[in-house]
Design a protein with these regions (language model features):
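Structural marker of alpha-solenoid helical repeat scaffolds
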Residues: 62, 96, 130, 164, ...
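Helix-start (N-cap) detector for alpha-helical repeat units in TPR-like alpha-solenoids
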Residues: 33, 67-68, 101-102, 135-136, ...
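Terminal, low-structured helical/coil segments at or just beyond the last alpha-helical repeat
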Residues: 24-27, 181, 185, 189-199, ...
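TPR/TPR-like (Sel1-like) alpha-helical repeat modules
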Residues: 162-165, 173-181, 193-194, 283-300, ...
Length: 660
């Protein structure tokens, strides 16, 4: 949050009449004090800060217990960039009146700007207690929790803030960001636990599929199947990638493989009906879908993208143009049929013709159908329902079942049922009930990652409902474009956001980062400097700015920025490598060696070991240089082999996707 954004919070307070404040704790303000107070406020509004300071000091000398005077004097100092003087006044104000929201808020903001989020937190907590109706206070508190590594606490804070400010686009955006971060944390835990896990490969496949890279998604699904060939859920995901690309034969083969592992899979049954429909076999397709709708109408609709559970993440993808044309040609034949399966088919065709036409229900299923009350909720019955994929019945019994001790595998399956029936928050609660050793398992973290993704999407959907043309909406669109590597579109959206809110944090950096990717150095530097003008502690802007000078071989200037990054965050990615390169170019080899040795364990392709070898050669340490050259060569060979294999696999996947 920028300085003007933070100070806007106090404009409300400054314009409040004195009668609306708890002024002097002993008595009402005297006429002399009121006159000086009014004069101070007039001067402040006219930006005559010297007069404002003089008048506020008169108020303080006449009424030393008047906390608001200290707060407003602190704001005058803040407006003149006299931060230490401002802090002293705010501290005095909160000692006199701990419930003074403005002073607590500005103290918290200033400590955040100084990089002391831990010290800022209690002041921001006091601010939201006193004024829960002010979104900015919740926003800064959430940011403080984020900086101190308490992302879960950040989520709780944002949800509480939205309870009091349900239409705050800032809180909704930050909530989506927080859920995304929790999802990334879950993926990182899988990576740390088992980098070869099929659950990690599956998550990567899902992300590539939704980002428009089906061939890469297929590679990761192949890796997942190689790691866990008997695990249900992988073949059907492969089938969906193939189906959406138009390879019906391979898709049908994968569906058959899924049904061998999970004979009662609703998802496989629905997709099998879709394949039959795309082949023009309407009776067979409707027969499959009649069976699916009888089992679970709401999930059947969601699988086909006809309906959403409110999270914007249905499995529906646009089919190829040829397949969509074939579907349209079947409409009249389907319209002659009666029943929920035909209605589902017609709704499916409509969504393929217009992807925005997801409906509440095509079959008459209500939102409650997936969680209707059932009895009895016996353990044996739960396992039977799970085995037959009757997940809506499992979800209905989940609250009762989760109160008792359960085997880890059963708790995980109940969490899956809750997620699949559109209940990610209860699913997360179920996963949190696992024992510590189990909650970090790849399977548990996989479902957590998926739950957080749904919740992030839900937050962004609410944001668009509040204001689809807001600066935060354009920021979300830009983030989506950047994730798809559509950089020019991302820059356009970020620029639209800045037009609406010029002081929006991080956007100048994001634009600059994208400009720097294509070596538009002057444009990138301009954006980085704009970001640093608002936030001198922005490590991303500092690092990228240093990188621009390093690329131009201005090592001294690069080090100025890289050292600032290191001082703020010694673990910032690549900072040690880049500092090592800068020191090398300045012939400061001992310092270069130190930095590159710190960076070496993260070397993936041999680059850092090669740079270190060159340093040792310059230092006359031939044995050490030969060792580093050998390590570099080993990594380069492995990287080259892996890249060649990946290229070949992607080519094979692309060929498979093009087959009818």
């Amino acid at each position: 949050m920028s300085v003007p954004f933070a100070i806007s919070f106090l404009l409300l307070i400054l314009t409040m009449p004195i009668g609306g404040q708890e002024s002097n704790p002993d008595s009402s303000l005297s006429p002399v004090v009121e006159a000086s107070w009014a004069a101070a406020q007039r001067a402040q509004q006219q930006k005559d800060y010297a007069t404002a300071e003089q008048e506020y000091r008169k108020v303080i000398s006449l009424s030393p217990g008047f906390a608001e005077a200290y707060m407003n004097l602190g704001l005058v100092y803040e407006l003149q960039s006299r931060r230490q003087d401002a802090l002293a006044m705010f501290e005095k104000a909160v000692r006199l009146k701990p419930g003074l929201a403005g002073a607590q808020f500005l103290l918290g903001v200033d400590y955040c700007k100084l990089g002391d989020a831990k010290r800022a937190t209690p002041h921001l907590e006091a601010a939201v207690r006193a004024r829960p109706d002010l979104p900015d206070a919740w926003t800064w508190l959430a940011s403080a929790y984020q900086v101190t590594g308490r992302t879960s606490r950040k989520v709780d804070t944002l949800q509480a803030g939205l309870g009091a400010n349900p239409h705050s686009i800032d809180l909704l955006y930050l909530l989506g960001q927080a859920y995304q971060q929790l999802g990334k944390d879950a993926v990182d835990r899988i990576q740390q636990k088992d980098s070869e896990s099929s659950f990690l490969a599956q998550l990567l496949a899902e992300n590539y599929a939704v980002s428009g890279y089906p061939s890469v998604a297929m590679l990761h699904l192949e890796d997942a199947l190689k790691a866990s060939p008997a695990r249900a859920g992988l073949h059907i995901e492969m089938a969906e990638v193939l189906l959406h690309a138009g390879n019906l034969k391979r898709a049908e083969d994968e569906i058959a493989a899924e049904l061998r592992l999970a004979p009662h899979s609703l998802r496989a049954l629905v997709r099998l009906g879709e394949v039959k429909l795309l082949r023009g076999d309407v009776p067979a397709a409707l027969a499959d879908w009649s069976q699916a709708v009888a089992l679970d109408p709401a999930r059947s609709e969601a699988i086909l993208g006809v309906r959403e559970f409110g999270f914007g993440d249905t499995s529906q993808e646009k089919l190829t143009e040829n397949l969509r044309a074939q579907l349209t040609g079947l409409r009249s034949q389907i319209e002659s049929q009666a029943g929920p399966a035909s209605r589902l088919a017609l709704a499916f065709i409509s969504t393929q013709e217009d992807a925005t036409r997801a409906v509440a229900s095509a079959t008459g299923a209500g939102d409650s159908d997936s969680v209707k009350s059932v009895s009895p909720c016996a353990l044996r019955q739960i396992r039977t329902w799970l085995a037959t994929d009757l997940l809506q019945l499992v979800a209905a019994c989940s609250a009762q079942m989760l109160k008792q001790p359960l085997a880890a595998d059963l708790r995980l399956e109940i969490a899956r049922a809750l997620y699949e029936t559109g209940l990610p928050e209860p699913a997360l609660a179920a996963l949190d009930g696992l024992a510590p050793a189990q909650v970090d398992s790849p399977q548990a973290q996989y479902w957590k990652a998926r739950c957080y993704k749904r919740l992030a999407l839900a937050a962004y959907l609410r944001l668009f409902e509040v204001d689809p043309d807001s600066y935060r909406a354009h920021q979300v669109l830009g983030d989506m474009d950047e994730a798809r590597e559509e950089d020019s579109k991302a820059v356009e959206e970020y620029e639209k956001a800045l037009v609406k809110r010029p002081t929006l944090p991080n956007l100048h950096y994001q634009i600059g980062h994208l400009e720097w990717k294509t070596y538009k150095t002057p444009e990138a530097r301009e954006q980085f400097q704009a970001e640093l003008a608002m936030n001198p502690r922005h490590t991303g802007a500092l690092f990228d700015l240093g990188s621009t000078y390093l690329q131009e071989r201005q090592a001294d200037k690069a080090l100025e920025y890289l050292k600032r990054v290191y001082d703020l965050d010694p673990k910032y990615p690549d900072v040690h490598q880049f500092m090592g390169i800068a020191y090398t170019r300045l012939n400061r080899y001992a310092e270069a060696e130190k930095e590159l040795k710190i960076a070496a364990p993260s070397d993936k392709d041999g680059t850092i070991h090669y740079q270190l070898a060159r340093v040792y050669l310059a230092m006359g340490k031939s044995a050490e240089a030969q060792r580093e050259f050998a390590l570099s060569n080993q990594l380069r060979v492995v990287t080259h082999r892996n890249n060649e294999e990946r290229v070949q696999r992607i080519a094979a996947a692309e060929a498979a996707l093009k087959q009818p």
